[in-house]
């Protein structure tokens, strides 16, 4: 091989993509020879650095990670009010505080909590995979957002240890480095950070005879326990409910992240409003929203963007986002970015022509009133089911005035008819999941019709066997939908004329077992969900939707939903969402200019 007047040494690494190229005159570039030899200590302390050369300064990590402050070809301009100084004074991720909360909820004074982080995933028959997403329970007590980790918490010794992978040089070359132990400790208040291969060794002192090991799921039992056999106890039942309960009340650090996610997402909603008259297809709205979030340091969405125009708005989780906006009255934009794994969840209903049609305005004002009145009642001690019942009452009053419903208000509420227009719960918790866990109680309803895995409420139990042990674990779903008879039970409670109510429901062809379950639900105050408490973050998202079988006149309206993220405070609430709505939204849509 000839290279003009120079001579080089070439070393292949993993096919042809990585070479060490050294000139005899001393100029070098590529992978330094020291990184071709496995040196775990060196890898822990350093990352690949480009050798000095005429163009290496242009490729420095600091340059590549600097956020743009001027417009690029997409037309997105970074808002100086959303600069990164929001993290100043935030401190370390409170992993230790979270671990202690879990131990308290667990009610254990000894034992080991063991959690596995997420590994890299690949699509079937492919060397490509989805974007990495850390397991949320693991992140809660570590703050570590990279693959291949584990964590142990010794409850008796109050010692929290993060276990991280060693990375081979060629992996660093292709995918970059992972944080070093020192960097992990600087970012999170874990006690120690070690390499995970030490955890795999039999002489590792973490797991001892006589201990109870708490795991989330039976399939996450560490293989390191094989040599201990029956000398340890495995509990795969209690940890998940304990962690769910701990996650319900957010720490100040968590609230700061949710507030930041709301700030970026609200600004992205405003950017869409200011450009609404320029769009011709739902996909353009989707693209602008996500692009704005990326430009402001929130590249991951909490859930797929819902840009549903016209009749698409009646599909709650519509995400095709590919329909023309021509002749569409309304757009529901349900979108929120996450920041450091913490979610936001924001919905706005936007008039596509720039102003509401008379029919659409009527429905929008009704939903706006439902939300305003419910938010105003939020404070500690209020049961969330009472807020939902109030939203239903406001909806029925409004629908009666519009002539959409006919009859007596009390009778309509008693029958649960409003569920045909407002079929989902008023809200849910927000945190590490957009539909976050709610602890041992559901936010709105506990039990009742449809309880169990994959349904709208309650618990289910799964069981597995490990080395002869029968391991039970509790499964809880998060998203709540409401049937007419559940709404009726929620509204009426237990009434003396129970048999008369049962007769009305049976005449409407409701199955007897579901009627009896709804009546049991109505008679139990403990089944009516959670009372709000300081530190909870919940959505308030009333909606009115129209289907052909309900009312053809409002079919083109599709649906209206307005959603904000609300922090429950000691004396009331704080609305974390600042995206314009109502009259402020209409004013924003009249503003001119780019983003």
UniProtKB/Swiss-Prot annotation:
Its EC number is 3.4.11.9. Binds 2 manganese ions per subunit. Residues 52-66 have a biased composition (Low complexity). InterPro entries: Aminopep_P_N, Creatin/AminoP/Spt16_N, Creatinase/aminopeptidase-like, Pept_M24, Peptidase_M24B_aminopep-P_CS, X-Pro_dipept-like. Gene3D superfamilies: Creatinase/methionine aminopeptidase superfamily, Creatinase/prolidase N-terminal domain. Its cofactor is Mn(2+). It catalyses: Release of any N-terminal amino acid, including proline, that is linked to proline, even from a dipeptide or tripeptide. SUPFAM superfamilies: Creatinase/aminopeptidase, Creatinase/prolidase N-terminal domain. Mn(2+) 2 binds at residues 334, 345, 563. It holds the Pfam family AMP_N. Keywords: Aminopeptidase, Hydrolase, Manganese, Metal-binding, Metalloprotease, Protease. It is an enzyme of class 3 (hydrolase). One of its GO terms (biological process) is proteolysis. GO terms for molecular function: manganese ion binding; metalloaminopeptidase activity. Residues 51-76 are annotated as: Disordered. Catalyzes the removal of a penultimate prolyl residue from the N-termini of peptides. Belongs to the peptidase M24B family. PANTHER family: XAA-PRO AMINOPEPTIDASE 3, XAA-PRO AMINOPEPTIDASE AN0832-RELATED. This is Probable Xaa-Pro aminopeptidase CHGG_02942. It comes from Chaetomium globosum (strain ATCC 6205 / CBS 148.51 / DSM 1962 / NBRC 6347 / NRRL 1970) (Soil fungus).
């Amino acid at each position: 091989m000839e290279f003009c007047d120079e001579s080089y040494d070439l070393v292949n690494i993993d096919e042809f993509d990585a070479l060490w190229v050294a000139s005899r005159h001393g100029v070098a570039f590529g992978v330094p020879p020291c990184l071709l030899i496995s040196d775990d200590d060196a890898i822990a302390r350093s990352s690949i650095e480009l050798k000095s050369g005429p163009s290496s300064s242009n490729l420095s990590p600091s340059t590549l990670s600097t956020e743009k402050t001027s417009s690029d070809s997409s037309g997105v301009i970074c808002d100086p009010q959303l600069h990164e100084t929001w993290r100043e004074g935030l401190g370390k991720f409170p992993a230790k505080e979270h671990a202690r909360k879990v131990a308290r909820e667990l009610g254990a004074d000894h034992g080991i909590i063991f959690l596995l982080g997420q590994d890299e995933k690949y699509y079937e028959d492919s060397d490509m995979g989805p974007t990495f997403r850390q397991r949320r329970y693991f992140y809660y007590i570590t703050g570590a957002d990279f693959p291949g980790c584990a964590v142990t918490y010794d409850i008796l010794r109050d010692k929290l240890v993060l276990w991280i992978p060693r990375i081979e040089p060629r992996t660093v070359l292709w995918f970059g480095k992972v944080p070093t132990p020192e960097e992990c400790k600087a970012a999170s208040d874990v006690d120690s950070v070690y390499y995970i291969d030490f955890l795999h060794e039999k002489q590792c002192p973490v797991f001892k005879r006589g201990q109870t090991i708490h795991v989330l799921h039976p399939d996450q039992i560490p293989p390191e326990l094989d040599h201990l056999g029956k000398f340890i106890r495995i509990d795969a039942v209690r940890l998940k409910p304990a962690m769910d309960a701990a996650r319900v009340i957010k720490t100040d650090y968590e609230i700061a992240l949710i507030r930041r996610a709301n700030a970026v997402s609200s600004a992205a909603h405003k950017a869409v409003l200011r450009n609404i008259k320029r769009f011709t297809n739902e996909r353009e709205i989707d693209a602008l929203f996500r692009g704005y979030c990326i430009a402001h340091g929130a590249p991951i969405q909490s859930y797929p963007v819902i840009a549903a125009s016209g009749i698409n708005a009646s599909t709650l989780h519509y995400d095709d986002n590919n329909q023309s906006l021509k002749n569409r009255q309304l757009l529901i934009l349900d979108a929120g970015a996450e920041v450091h794994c913490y979610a936001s969840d924001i919905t706005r209903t936007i008039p596509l022509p720039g102003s509401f049609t008379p029919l659409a305005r009527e429905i929008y004002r009704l939903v706006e009133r439902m939300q305003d009145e419910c938010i105003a009642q939020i404070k500690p001690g209020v049961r969330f089911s009472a807020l939902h019942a109030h939203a239903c009452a406001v909806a029925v009053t409004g629908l009666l005035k519009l002539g959409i419903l006919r009859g007596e208000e009390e009778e309509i509420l008693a029958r649960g008819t409003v569920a045909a227009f407002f079929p989902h719960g008023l809200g849910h918790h927000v945190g590490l999941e957009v539909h976050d866990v709610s602890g041992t109680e559901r936010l709105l309803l506990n039990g009742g019709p449809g309880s169990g895995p994959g349904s709208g409420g309650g618990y289910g139990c799964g069981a597995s066997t490990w080395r002869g042990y029968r391991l039970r674990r509790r499964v809880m779903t998060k998203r709540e939908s409401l049937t007419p008879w559940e709404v009726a039970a929620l509204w009426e409670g237990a009434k003396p004329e129970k048999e008369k109510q049962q007769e009305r429901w049976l005449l409407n062809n409701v199955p007897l077992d579901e009627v009896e379950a709804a009546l049991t639900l109505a008679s139990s105050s403990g089944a009516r969900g959670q009372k709000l408490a300081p530190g909870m973050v919940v959505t308030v998202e009333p909606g009115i939707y129209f289907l052909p079988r309900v009312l053809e006149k409002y079919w083109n309206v599709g649906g209206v939903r307005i959603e904000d993220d609300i922090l429950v405070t000691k004396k009331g609430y704080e609305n974390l969402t600042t995206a314009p709505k109502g009259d402020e939204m209409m004013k924003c849509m009249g503003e001119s200019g780019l983003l």
